[in-house]
Amino acid sequence: MYISGGENVYPAEVENVLYQLPQIGEAAIIGVPDERWGETGVAFISLKAGENLEEKDLISHCIENLAKFKVPSKVEFIEALPRNATGKVLKRTLREDYIGSDAPAIS
């Protein structure tokens, strides 16, 4: 769970909405620091082989099916989600890699 603008956001709820799109093979949502909202969601998406999906289409789908504060602010398309030996998605790794790359710092 992360908190965006004082509201609890459960990644599983957002991920379930994303999996409604047939192009998505894997999806993970993480909360990252945001100066305005405290935290905001970033969607990491791995598409099924041969499929195409644009960020604007994914965001539009989320806007239609989620409360505004639950809609991811950014989408990152990746080949595959990082997993541990038992197959669990390593969201901590996604978060650390994202924050270390270009996410804004909170003062």
Label for each model-derived stretch:
Residues 1-70, 79-82, 87, 93-96:
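AMP-binding/adenylate-forming catalytic core of the ANL superfamily
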Residues 96-107:
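Acidic/polar alpha-helix N-cap and adjacent early helical turns
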